[in-house]
Amino acid sequence: MFASVLKKIVGTKNDRELKKYSLIQREINALESSIAALSDEQLKEKTPYFKEKLHTGASLDDILPEAFAVVREVARRTVNMRPFDVQLIGGMVLHEGKIAEMKTGEGKTLVATMPMYLNALEGKGAHLVTVNDYLASRDAEWMSPIYSFLGLSVGVIVHGMDDDERRAAYACDITYGTNNEFGFDYLRDNMKYSLEDYTQREFNYSIVDEVDSILIDEARTPLIISGPSEESTDKYYRINQIIPRLKKERDYTIDEKSRTVVLTEEGVARVESYLNVSNLYEPRNIDTLHHVNQALKAHTLFKRDVDYLVKDGQVIIVDEFTGRIMPGRRYSDGLHQALEAKEKVKIEQENQTLASITFQNFFRMYSKLAGMTGTADTEAAEFKKIYNLDVVVVPTNMPMIRVDHTDVIYKTEKEKFSAVIEEIKELHKAKRPVLVGTISIEKSELLSKYLTQTGIQHHVLNAKNHEKEAEIVSQAGQPGQVTISTNMAGRGTDIKLGERVAELGGLHILGTERHESRRIDNQLRGRSGRQGDMGSSRFYLSLEDDLLRIFGAEKISSIMDKIGIEENQPIEHKLISRAIENAQKRVEGQNFDIRKHLLEYDDVMNRQRQVIYEQRRNVLKGDELREDLLDMIEEVVEDFVPEYVDEKRHPDEWNLKGLEDRVLKQFSLRLDFSKSGDVGSLEDIQEKIVAAVNDLLNRKEAEFGKPLMDYLIRMISIQSIDSHWKDHLLAMDHLKEGIGLRGYGQKDPVREYQKEGYDLFMDMIRRIKEDTLEKLCMVQIRREEEVEEMREQSRQNYIMNRGEDIAAPATVRRKNEKVGRNDPCPCGSGKKYKKCCGANK
């Protein structure tokens, strides 16, 4: 009560933000007449003038009013569009690194030009991120006259470009592109063998269009670059054959709320019998159990034409939020292969991850991040918690006059669709356009069948005919048009009204089901009532809809009983609408928890990724190549010598023969400790080995020449890093798969993942060093004839020794890993140990 009274007196936080921006907006308006009086040449001179001001100490905020006024005037002269006052406010929100919620049709594309221009003046680049190549190319083409007039270069990143084209686009002052392209370029750059081949520069400033789609809906989908694994695909066919023989409840149970399926004890026994396995939970059968679970998921939780479609012999994922197909994307962990087996199409090999990153961690690398969308306020808490982004709701330029009717609810889906058809008939008779929203391809085709039976002409827009999207959407606001669409029509499209449609009441939005997220429903509604147009919306629901059936049926049924609703009678009641909204909030909260939980795990991988990528870049720079190599030799020697030389024991008990063998294997050096009498102390032995390795590498440098030796050090180091990083990613995946079970032992799975992940990481760092030095010490330059002789000898040896496995003895490792001088400092500073806590050691 007190809070609501206080809000009325001092206003909401959003009101206070808007008041602050309004003061600056008035400053910009005051400059308009003087800026308009400038010639084209004088306007063009403003860019070098602003850059000079920044160079002499002015901040971006200092020059904002004049810079925005300049962009407004240039927009009027070049693209014949003058930003409204609310668009100036939207631009200020974006400049401050916040999210601007602006309704459909409010001109977000134009809004972005002002903060993009301002932030590009620093010369560090500014990125505008969109959801697809079409929008990236379109927006860059629309707005480039403004930037070009002001002397700034514009680049576009789209799929299919080569590295030279990408490098040129990233070098521009302003770069448009998609989230996928920006993310994959980052991963690809960090797999390259030369800094000159990198395409991207620093991550300075970014505006993410449709920010809720990219940073929330896509947050659970990592970008992955993968290579083929060598596993056979036969197991997927074999396991797929047994799944139809299992029965629900008897052999497995489904939890639709958490989208999980679990085998019962009877089901486990039946699977063991079908697969001729004695114990499915034995360590050697864990892989089989995993693939059985994935096959169960594929058959019970994933529906064709809802979650995916089959096209040209391929299983293609359908994005649940946008309704669009996602060619090239595949489910991981064998799930996609299980779906391919289920649909009897060719099974592609499962891939091994070579590099990956989530959008959450990619976009957090930008010095300043901003976003814009028509629907963000419902997720404001998540934006703040995960990305530290505030949401500011920007008012519309014209008052919103769309009428949003309360939901109408029926007991069965059949009754609901009958009512939907009747309403469409009435609207069609009145020549009023209607956009019907469905949540899946399956439902859009079902409704289309009903409309065809009644003789109503209509268009269907879903992932199966996405190529006709522009044509269908352009006609959707014409008199008498009936358009059925999945979530595809919910974003990035403006539906313009035909002649006299406004007099009929504008475009009517008819939703046939509530989505799990209120944002998706709001996006559908937002297709109508743009820029002060007339319009209306209504949702038709049934208790058989997934959302209500899984999350709200009991509560809503009890409300219906209290109200006294009979069969076939529709319900319109605020209590019901509130119960539905509460169900959506519960699902949103659940999904937020899942994303937050995934981020906690990914943050561990992210810190490791940053260290590895920094090490790669340092090797490629080569600034301290020889110093780092000497440190590496010392660290490897100091790591393994104590395994053979224990100073607590008498020298006669030292394993000097084992040490000689280890030095020979590690460095290709024959050193004789056992016959040299007094071998000295542990430190003496270490110094002797380090000196010998150094001498060997110096001889190689004298033979090869310094340029070739430096090249070999770089290439061998990078190959070792990449090879072991790939294996480490797989090990971390396996660790994450089983870590959840630690909760049953009263341990925090995330803490355990952090601890064991760190141990795996430090072990990988050790192996990278050993591998690099082993290869460097072995490398030789051979004549072509010698190489051919060696190849032939290798072939002969393979034929002679085929089938023989020689087990290498396991090396005993000390329990606590020693921190190497080049390793990341355990204190968490991000610096090398030798330049942090180890500086004085």
Curated annotation (Swiss-Prot):
NCBIfam families xrefs: PRK09200.1, PRK12904.1, secA
Q: What is its EC number?
A: 7.4.2.8
Q: Report the co-factor binding details.
A: May bind 1 zinc ion per subunit.
Q: Could you say which residues bind ATP here?
A: Q87, G105, E106, G107, K108, T109, D494
Instruction: Give yes or no: UniProt keyword Transport.
Output: yes
Its Gene Ontology biological processes? intracellular protein transmembrane transport; protein import; protein targeting; protein transport by the Sec complex
Q: What is this protein called?
A: Protein translocase subunit SecA
Organism the protein comes from: Syntrophus aciditrophicus (strain SB)
Topology class, membrane: Peripheral membrane protein
Q: Which family does it belong to?
A: Belongs to the SecA family.
User: What reaction does this catalyse?
Assistant: ATP + H2O + cellular proteinSide 1 = ADP + phosphate + cellular proteinSide 2
**Disulphide bridges, residue numbers:** none
